[in-house]
């Protein structure tokens, strides 16, 4: 049976393609007829304009198909673990037990909520960074009567709102209760994230303690960075600081880190341009040169926390914690990708061999951290890049290199289509040269859009939360 016969949009797409093709051929015929008496310059200009019109129509069609195509799949047709497209799969959630914390680490480690950054008072410059939460699905006890319990960091508000939605789904008629958020009265220990608006103490509106284990699990699923079922009376949750969010959300390198160009020259990432061909890595660990097609993030002024991986061959990779790094599994002889802040000493990463130019495993001998200025996240067509001789992914946040690479497929397709278009310089007498200073500053719109939807389509176990 023909697949297009059972999928209405496929037939429509076929008709559209034929229509576009007919229009292009029709316009080509008209152009050919009128170009008999036209000068060579006029004919060239008409040809360029005609090509651009056809490719513009093709680009619109491809964009439409990219939007409609995923909607035609059901969960039964999706591959791999996790949630499929369409309705979410039902997953078994297990409640936390009393005294359990997730992750099972100190709250102030980088893999949890991160270090303290200082108490925020009403007269502190950072007080303006706290935001009120007026979600009607959340009850705030507000014992002080000052509205302080509604104030929190942006990340804390985001996760709390997600949790409130989960609570209503889990227990219809029950709402999330916040008993403490930002604290200005020093009711907690000397080292508490309540003073920074990064922690909340929560319960359910019916105060049913039998629900608290599952409430803690829902908080983990909502993306809180540290959850503790420390007391029978409430659940404690905290998040990373907003200032470290971009390092956590978008994987980046330092601008001073270098990439190897195809001509053999090493170039700082802060000076890379779209179109540069840099050393990358194939899916099976082979060295290959790949084109830079965009920057997912680029900000040369932003201060950021980085993880530093030192190898026994004296290579040093400086990268944000949520970035994926290639790790060689010697026992299984397989290449995997691991979040940078979860790489451990004695793990092996792939490093370029100076003599052969091939990528070889080197042992990590030290894992450190550093705070530095500037972030750069180039995306190559291959989805990988060798930085400071160490092979790394171009992706972050999601612990699947293949899924992340699939998610950026529209950008690779768009880059290919743009390459087919006649150069704009053909329409102008003097081409414009784009300097480094004129390049993108900030997060790419498509990467930012993917980040915003990830919490709604991916399980927490797939995310660096």
From Swiss-Prot:
List of residues binding Ca(2+) 1: 143-144, 149, 179-180
Lipid-attached positions, N-palmitoyl cysteine: 79
Protein origin, superkingdom: Eukaryota
Alphabetized SMART domains for the sequence: HintC, HintN
Site residues (Involved in cholesterol transfer), renumbered to this chain: 297
Gene3D superfamilies (UniProt xref): 3.30.1380.10, Hedgehog/Intein (Hint) domain (2.170.16.10)
InterPro entries: Hedgehog (IPR001657), Hedgehog_Hint (IPR001767), Hedgehog_sig/DD-Pept_Zn-bd_sf (IPR009045), Hedgehog_Signaling (IPR050387), Hedgehog_signalling_dom (IPR000320), Hint_dom_C (IPR003586), Hint_dom_N (IPR003587), Hint_dom_sf (IPR036844)
Lipidation (Cholesterol glycine ester): 251
Enzyme class, UniProt record, top EC level: hydrolase
Keywords from the named record: Autocatalytic cleavage, Calcium, Cell membrane, Cytoplasm, Developmental protein, Hydrolase, Lipoprotein, Membrane, Metal-binding, Morphogen, Nucleus, Palmitate, Protease, Segmentation polarity protein, Signal, Transferase
Site for Involved in auto-cleavage, residues: 320
Keyword Hydrolase found: yes
Pfam families from the UniProt entry: HH_signal, Hint
A Gene Ontology BP annotation from the UniProt entry: spiracle morphogenesis, open tracheal system
Site (Cleavage): 251-252
Cited PANTHER family: HEDGEHOG, PROTEIN HEDGEHOG
Family: Belongs to the hedgehog family.
Name this polypeptide is given: Protein hedgehog
Organism: Drosophila erecta (Fruit fly)
